[in-house]
């Protein structure tokens, strides 16, 4: 077990990496509820700081620091909004870590093989909306490996597949519509 200062240093370094480097990874999101069988959703994530792009089979979402882009290939519709902080957190679970650190009890443990640090954040105040946030970080490079969010009877797990830091461009966080795409601009 690490001291609280060591845990906060690991989290701070991890969050600094997310702010200063471009993370890219394929992933699987598993959503499990007590009454239903778990559902798996594959996708790809690219993020740098608050900016991100998520591509999944039925939706594409991007945030460039100001505008949220949500594209549905099924309807060929692109919706533009100015998202709330909560909408951003729901779109990219890695952003939760930064928001939760100041308002949570933090517990750390090392994986059995010693290659990962597992950080559990439990809100001090249950009005936060989640019961538990578990982050697994690879020790060698502070790369996120998985995030688990427990909300009531629902558990969502994001498992990264071969995450890496890459060179990224700001244009990566914008979705440009095709000529015939319907654009629903809801920005204020």
Task: Give the location of each predicted region.
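Extracytoplasmic
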Residues: 20-22, 40, 63, 101-103, ...
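Flexible, surface-exposed loop/linker segments and immediately adjacent secondary-structure boundaries
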Residues: 83-115
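Short, surface-exposed coil-to-beta transition loops
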Residues: 38-42, 55-57, 64-65, 128-133, ...
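Short beta-strand micro-motifs enriched in acidic
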Residues: 46-48, 109-111, 136-140
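Short beta-strand segments that buttress and anchor functional surface loops
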Residues: 27-29, 53-57, 118-125, 146-150
């Amino acid at each position: 077990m690490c001291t609280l200062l060591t845990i906060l240093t690991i989290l701070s370094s991890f969050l600094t990496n997310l702010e200063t480097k471009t993370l890219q990874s394929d992933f699987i999101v598993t959503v499990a509820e007590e009454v239903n069988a778990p559902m798996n959703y594959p996708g790809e994530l690219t993020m740098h700081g608050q900016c991100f792009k998520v591509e999944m089979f039925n939706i594409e979402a991007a945030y460039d620091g100001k505008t949220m882009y949500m594209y549905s290939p099924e309807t060929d519709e692109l919706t533009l909004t100015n998202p709330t902080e909560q909408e951003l957190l729901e779109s990219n679970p890695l952003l939760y870590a930064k928001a939760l650190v100041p308002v949570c009890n933090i517990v750390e443990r090392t994986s059995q093989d010693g290659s990962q640090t597992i950080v559990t954040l439990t809100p001090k105040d249950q009005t936060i909306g989640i019961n538990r946030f578990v982050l697994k970080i690879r020790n060698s490079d502070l790369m996120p490996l998985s995030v688990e969010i427990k909300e009531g009877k629902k558990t969502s797990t994001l498992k990264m597949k071969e995450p890496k830091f890459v060179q990224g461009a700001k244009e990566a966080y914008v979705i440009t519509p095709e000529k015939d795409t319907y654009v629903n601009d809801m920005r204020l």
